[in-house]
Amino acid sequence: MPASLTTKFLNQTYENPLMNASGVHCMTTKELDELAASRAGAFITKSSTTLERAGNPEPRYVSVPLGSINSMGLPNQGIDYYLEYVLERQRTHPNEPAIFFSVAGMSIDENINMLRKIQDSEFHGITELNLSCPNVPGKPQVAYDFDLTKEILDKVFQFFKKPLGIKLPPYFDFAHFDIMAGILNQYPLAYVNSINSVGNGLYIDVDKESVVVKPKNGFGGIGGEYVKPTALANVRAFYTRLNPSIKIVGTGGIRTGKDVFEHLLCGASMVQIGTELVKEGVPIFERLERELKEVMDKKGYTTIEEFRGKLNSL
């Protein structure tokens, strides 16, 4: 019996667990339409702010041998642009599974106001609150401040009743996994997305003896193969600490079907692709779908649930 990638996530059924990562190939309606027409099981919009943002000066994204470095600074078309798109798509494609919608305000108040707009709208998809952008100068990553994270979630869940996930930065200490999981378990979160890019890396052009991205004197978020072990560790750490009702979306270092399998084995329910999607474009989803099926067939698995989260210890 051939492997099935059918994925149940919340109350939705997707053909496979593959998605784009917010920020990649989702800036415009054209790119979003291309995602919708691809073999991705689901897709997510660009992280939006209240108003349109140009982001950081270029060059701000560079592909490097094992991944990427970026300091985009949240360029986007503004929340109304993306909300109009998803509402129209709901109307014209009523039988499609839920769309993911990402927001990343510059302040608590901005996030609250955007989430109120989503709550008051007819959007019936899944919202992702990005608490982990490392590339806005002068703006720390919210999710490294545990008290502030709790303050935001307290305010959000006073009024937000639709499915909500949060995107987290990578953590590197067991105490931090424990603290953050303890906070998140207090709320009716739909999911946690781990990880955003590893913040403030530095990549050097030896020939020019210079950095390769302009913002922040060359410091930027690292993605791709460099971050896969960190991403897998975060997926596993939260999978084993969070309430079973809080699902995991695994992001970081996915280049092959084997990488997808590893994220699922660590406990992810869905996975998002960023760096490699930039390099290959939307045909990557067809390749990853095929390669994941090949891995599963070789191992004798017919469904993802047969192995998801069942990582063996020594």
From Swiss-Prot:
SUPFAM superfamilies: FMN-linked oxidoreductases. GO terms for biological process: 'de novo' pyrimidine nucleobase biosynthetic process; 'de novo' UMP biosynthetic process. GO terms for molecular function: dihydroorotate dehydrogenase (fumarate) activity. It comes from Naumovozyma castellii (Yeast). Disulfide bonds: none annotated. It catalyses: (S)-dihydroorotate + fumarate = orotate + succinate. Binds 1 FMN per subunit. One of its GO terms (cellular component) is cytoplasm. Its cofactor is FMN. Pathway: Pyrimidine metabolism; UMP biosynthesis via de novo pathway. Keywords: Cytoplasm, Flavoprotein, FMN, Oxidoreductase, Pyrimidine biosynthesis. The lineage of its organism: Eukaryota, Fungi, Dikarya, Ascomycota, Saccharomycotina. FMN binds at K46, S47, N130, K167, I195, G224, G252, G253, G274, T275. The active site is at S132 (nucleophile), C133 (nucleophile). The keyword Ligase does not apply. PROSITE patterns: DHODEHASE_1 (PS00911), DHODEHASE_2 (PS00912). This is Dihydroorotate dehydrogenase (fumarate). Belongs to the dihydroorotate dehydrogenase family. Type 1 subfamily. Its main location: cytoplasm. It comes from the Eukaryota. Its EC number is 1.3.98.1. The keyword Metal-binding does not apply. It is found in: Cytoplasm. The gene is URA1. Substrate binds at K46, N70, S71, M72, G73, L74, N130, N196, S197.
